[in-house]
Every structure is written in C-alpha cells, then in structure tokens.
Amino acid sequence: LKHILITGCGSGLGRKAAITLASRGHYVYATTHTDEQAYKLNMLNRKWKLPMESFKLDVLCKEDREKVRDLPIDVLINNAAIGDSGSIAEIDVNRFRATFETNVFCPIELTQIVLKGMIKRRKGRIIFLSSLTGRMAIPFLSPYCSTKFALESIGYCLNKELKQLPRVNIPVILIEPGSYATGFNQLNVSKQFNWMKVNSYFKNRINKLQRKQYLYFKLTESTNMDSIVMKYVAAAEEPHPKFRYIAPYVQGCVAKAKNILKK
C-alpha cells in the first residue's frame, strides 16, 4: 500500500481516481484547487471513512506546493490542468502562458519538490496526466494540446534521466485520456467564443466552428470513466508499469492510426 498525492481532485477524473485508489487501501492525499473543494471532500469522507485526506494545493501557489515537501509520498500524480482555446493567429499570448504555467511549469516544480524525498529513499513513482491530444492535436485547441505535447517530452526525458541514477527506481509514467464526459471539454471549447465573437479573423465562421467542435465531443465522449480510472490504478500499482497508459481503447487506436498516416 502506498502514499499517493494527486492534484486536481476537486472534480472529474482526479476526484474519481482519488476515491478509487483510497478504496483499494492506499493512503491518498486528494488535493484540490480551493479550500471549499477540500472541505466538501473531507466531509464526504466522514461517511466513507477511506484512508484519504484532502487539502488545498493550488499548483500555481508556491506556498501550497511547499506543503508537500515533507510528506512520505510514494506516488505523485500530476493531474491538475486547465484548458484554453482559440487560433494561434490571434489568441492573446498571455492565455497561452497561463495554460503552460498550470499544465507544465507548476507540475515540473511540484515534481522537483517530491523527487527530493523519492531520490533520497531511492524509490517512488511520478505520473503525468497527458492526453491523446498530446499526440493528436485539435485545431483551435492548441493552447491545451501544446501543453500535453510538452508533457509527452517531459515525461519521456525525465524517465530516461532518472534511470541514470544508480540504485534508484523511480519510473515516470504518462496517462493519456481520450475524450470523457466530465464537462472539461465543453468548458475548454467555450473559452474562445467569449472573445472571437467580438473581434476575430474567423468571426464569420464562428457559428460553424462552434457547432463542429461541440458535435465532435458529443460524438466522441465516453460517459464511463472507469476505463481511464483503472489506468490511474495500473500506473500506481503495477510492479513494472508501462511508460504510457491510454483509454478509451478505440480512441487510442484512432490516435495511433492518425499518427502513422501523417508519416
């Protein structure tokens, strides 16, 4: 049984993964973006009585990241993420920066803090929540997709780098969810239309773009999150984990086929 820290447990996949891992006997630090989310999760756990505690860890906040420095963490799951959307031709670069700050730079900083203890103990496990969009980008969702492409590279390099340390066993793992009905995709897509309808190169095509993007997720989203949550479990528990875990299976096959055809 392991001590597992997960970021972004206030809702969605992170919340479900935290509850599932705790129900399997692991001690889970189910961290959230806000104090209110942590309070609600702790109140629910009074009934569940799972080996789980929740507290605020806003990945953007240095003081929050420092809270975990002395925790005995066996597995870190960098799950927290935000999305943004719009064309590279015109989106405010600060929106791009903000997405990278939350999805890439802050997880790197948190990973460095947790790794100090893991390297000292010579064991641990680092998991990054990437995405199938990290290998199969979607036009107008580039702020989000590009952060996931970055995590693919970061995960690969860190995994190889840690193997250079003698007698240290810290695998680095990527989890790549496809499209799931958590509400995240709709929120991500909607952000661009707040400003593109006012002033955009594409304003005459906004309605068509809007219909197309919402239809795409309506057709592809899986309503059963169990398939991807069990990948969190496998990544945390398997004695010899794979580098990459993908779900749903069909969406993973489509992404692989598209990458092959591009070549």
Tell me the role of every PLM-derived stretch.
Residues 10-11:
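Conserved glycine-rich cofactor-binding loop
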Residues 87-88, 95-97:
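Substrate-binding pocket helix/loop in short-chain dehydrogenase/reductase
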Residues 131:
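Residue(s) in the substrate-gating loop at a strand-loop-helix junction
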